[in-house]
C-alpha cells in the first residue's frame, strides 16, 4: 500500500470515529434538554403548521407557555 493511501485511510477512520462520537451525544436544542419542556414542545410542533415551531418553543418562554395553554384546552 502506498504511504499516501495509508494516510488517507487513517484520516478517514479518525473522521468516522469523531462523527460517531459527536452524533451519539446530540441533545435537543435550547432549553429542550429538559424532558419536562421537550415533551410539550414536541406535541405542539406536531399540531402546528409553523415549520420551526419546535425550535421556537425550546428557545422562547412565551412560545412555550402558549404551547402549554394549547395543550390544556
From Swiss-Prot:
Expressed by the venom gland. Its main location: secreted. Disulfide bonds join 32-58, 41-57, 44-67. Keywords: Disulfide bond, Ion channel impairing toxin, Neurotoxin, Potassium channel impairing toxin, Secreted, Signal, Toxin, Voltage-gated potassium channel impairing toxin. Contains 3 disulfide bonds. Residues 1-23 form the signal peptide. Coiled coil: none annotated. It comes from the Eukaryota. GO terms for molecular function: potassium channel regulator activity; toxin activity. It is found in: Secreted. The keyword Signal applies. One of its GO terms (cellular component) is extracellular region. Inhibits voltage-gated potassium channels. This is Kappa-scoloptoxin(03)-Ssm1b.
